[in-house]
Regions:
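N-terminal alpha/beta PP-like core and its mobile active-site loop of ThDP/TPP-dependent enzymes
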Residues: 2-7, 17, 21-212, 216-390, ...
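Thiamine diphosphate
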Residues: 20, 128-135, 322, 373, ...
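Active-site diphosphate/adenylate-binding microenvironment
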Residues: 28-31, 36-41, 46-58, 400-480, ...
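Phosphate/pyrophosphate-binding active-site segments
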Residues: 2-4, 22, 180-181, 192-197, ...
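Hydrophobic "anchor" residues on beta-strands that sit immediately upstream
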Residues: 118, 437, 490-491
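N-terminal cationic-hydrophobic initiation segments that often serve targeting/anchoring roles
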Residues: 83, 169, 284, 429, ...
């Protein structure tokens, strides 16, 4: 009888091949059924040979549309964006080896933005691993390094593996789960250290208990899927919250005491508060309490209202308002969104989170702050019941934001024949309807696009916030157009970011998506150029590209393309694009010299000191330097 490495395995035993194919079809049907049951309606990917073709086929049989992308990271970003917009798990299919490796950046984005994505990959079958090294990677370890968890699904009980993957992805804090499909895996003995899987607590504690083996791997069996835990699986140093309303009040006692004493509180709204939009609006509207939003939380409080005070990123545009406050309260703030700058405000900082993992990270980032693990709904009720004592003037949030945005708009003027990034964003915003969804790539232009693009509803402004990856905007725009049909979609990207996903323009053409791609084209990695020292950092060769016509490339790929160099031309081309049945790429010539002033205003000293020396509308003199926080 031939063993695992014997002739039958090496040359392909027909009976084994038939069994393996049957296991592949069963596993594919199981994962599609679990996704469909959780509300997933689209699947993205770049398939290879092997079981993932069965997954694509099972999706089609179940009425789940498959969207072919040009790159695995782009496909994963599409899946993550659909998860962001719909709440259902995103689904992406990749092949083994290079396919999964190429998806890593997209998986990392989903991990740091806490988005539930099921990444379905082939793997070298266990019975071939002793002999086959072609495309053989330790995919469990690879998944563990960037995802919330990694599963290896064998033929014994694929339904259990599929259900587990979906539950893990959705359990707070949400995140991606890699499922390695191995229909040929034989039963192996289980070992100790297997975590006990159970439903996540309503408070958002870790989705499973127990300790994974030190190596982070577990053998595959016919009875249970192999599981490895990744960096976002849960844990942290803070205890889980007590159950019940009385316990919630106990956990929030420090917040209640701080609110009673505060005269000038400021709220920081993070993505955790997106599940409580109605309650937050009811509590804050008319309260006079300014509310700063993280990137992912934009729209919880409408920008057209009096309370929305702009962005909080850890930069300096928010500094005047926070420096004038006497209490800073964060609701659902995720430190992954904050840039690595010092947090040294004099006001006490209190962060409320529903998961101990996020709270543990918060207490490390917000120096001197207090992190509370408690239901956000209870915290919102507490804020509503403790109105502030009138230390802020009327509409302080609106006034603060208006002043900051006015300074940003006027930070720099473009040279004749070129556009400033401010010109681009304000023109596009002025000529698009309120329900437009904007996606923003990482790069210097995001420092302008994120604050200047105002929204009145959540999920209308999307960015890779935790990972801040380039190459996000176009795949995210594709997903937004598919997952929210009817809403206009605009992608803001730089020449660097578009270069990473250029062929996805063909995807928009093939799918006939009305997506407008606006390229900030200065042939430069402008954000990196600003950070370069005059010597020792590689000079122009490290940050400069040869000028390219993205409008011409778009036309070659079947999209409409237009080059613009002034606001009037941009407005005209935008109007045509919004009425076109298909995608448009607008190639905007940008003056890169304008970014230096933008960087200083948003990340440097200029943001700390408004021209008047006072916070607009507060009447409070601002300190001239940051003070160490006295919070505990």
């Amino acid at each position: 009888m031939a063993g695992p490495g014997g002739p039958a395995a090496q040359h392909g035993d027909p009976q084994h091949r038939d069994s393996q194919h049957g296991g592949s079809r069963r596993g594919a049907a199981a994962i599609v059924a679990a996704l469909a049951g959780a509300g997933t309606r689209l699947m993205f990917g770049v398939p290879g040979g092997g079981p993932n073709l069965d997954v694509v086929g099972a999706a089609a049989a179940a009425g789940m549309s498959f969207v072919l992308a040009h790159g695995e990271t782009a496909a994963t970003i599409m899946a993550a964006t659909c998860a962001d917009l719909t709440g259902a798990p995103g689904a992406v299919v990749v092949t083994r080896g290079p396919g999964l490796a190429s998806a890593v950046n997209g998986i990392a984005h989903a991990t740091l933005d806490r988005l539930p994505v099921i990444v379905i990959a082939d793997t070298v079958p266990a019975h071939q691993r002793d002999r086959v090294s072609h495309q053989r990677l330790d995919q469990a370890a690879l998944g563990r390094s960037v995802a919330k968890a990694a599963l290896t699904a064998g033929p014994g009980q694929p339904e259990q593996a599929a259900d587990l993957a979906v539950r893990l992805a959705l359990a707070a804090p949400a995140g991606p789960v890699v499922v390695n499909m191995d229909p040929g895996t034989r039963a192996m003995p289980a070992t100790s250290g297997a975590p006990a899987i159970g439903p996540a607590a309503s408070t958002g504690t870790a989705p499973f208990t127990g300790t994974a083996p030190a190596t982070g791997t577990m053998p595959v069996t016919d009875d249970a899927p192999a599981l490895t835990r990744g960096p976002a699986a849960g844990g942290g140093t803070l205890p889980a919250p007590r159950a019940g309303a009385d316990a919630a009040g106990h956990e929030l006692a420090p917040l209640a005491a701080a609110l009673r004493a505060a005269r000038r509180p400021v709220l920081l709204l993070g993505p955790g508060a997106l599940a409580h939009v109605a309650a937050v609006r009811e509590a804050l509207t008319g309260s006079g309490i300014p509310a700063l939003h993280t990137d992912r939380a934009r729209g919880i409080m409408p920008d057209s209202g009096d309370e929305a005070a702009g962005l909080v990123t850890g930069g300096t545009m928010e500094w005047p308002l926070l420096a004038a406050s006497d209490l800073i309260v964060g609701l659902g703030v995720d430190p992954a969104e904050m840039i690595p700058a010092a947090w040294d405000y004099a006001a006490r900082t209190i962060l409320v989170s529903e998961t101990s993992a996020v709270a543990a990270e918060a207490v490390r980032y917000f120096t001197g702050g207090t992190a509370l693990v408690a239901p956000l709904g209870a915290a919102i009720e507490l804020i509503a019941a403790h109105p502030h004592h009138g230390g802020w003037p009327p509409a302080a949030g609106r006034t603060a934001k208006a002043g900051a945005l006015a300074r940003l708009r006027e930070a720099a003027r473009a040279a004749p024949g070129l556009l400033s990034p401010q010109d681009v964003v304000t023109t596009v915003r002025a000529h698009t309807p309120p329900e437009t969804i904007a996606t923003v790539d990482a790069g210097a232009h995001m420092l302008v696009a994120m604050p200047l693009w105002e929204v009145d509803e959540p999920h209308r402004l999307l960015i890779s916030s935790g990972l801040a990856t380039m190459g996000y905007a176009l795949p995210a725009a594709i997903a937004a157009a598919l997952c929210t049909p009817g809403a206009p979609v605009v992608a803001f990207t730089g020449d660097g970011g578009l270069g990473m996903t250029l062929m996805e323009i063909e995807t928009t053409v093939r799918l006939r998506l009305r997506v407008v791609v606006v390229v900030f084209n200065d042939a430069t990695l402008s954000l990196i150029k600003i950070k370069q020292r005059p010597a020792g950092h590689g000079g122009p060769a490290a940050v400069g590209y040869r000028p390219a016509s993205f409008a011409a490339v778009a036309t070659a790929l079947g999209a409409a393309g237009a080059a613009v160099s002034d606001a009037a031309g941009l407005a005209s081309e935008l109007a045509a694009a919004l009425n076109r049945d298909g995608p448009t790429v607008i190639d905007a010539s940008i003056d890169p010299a304008t970014y230096t002033a933008v960087m200083d205003l948003t990340r440097g000293e200029a943001g700390r000191h408004p021209p008047t020396g006072h916070h607009p509308g507060t009447g409070h003199h601002l300190p001239t330097a940051r003070h160490a926080s006295t919070g505990t």
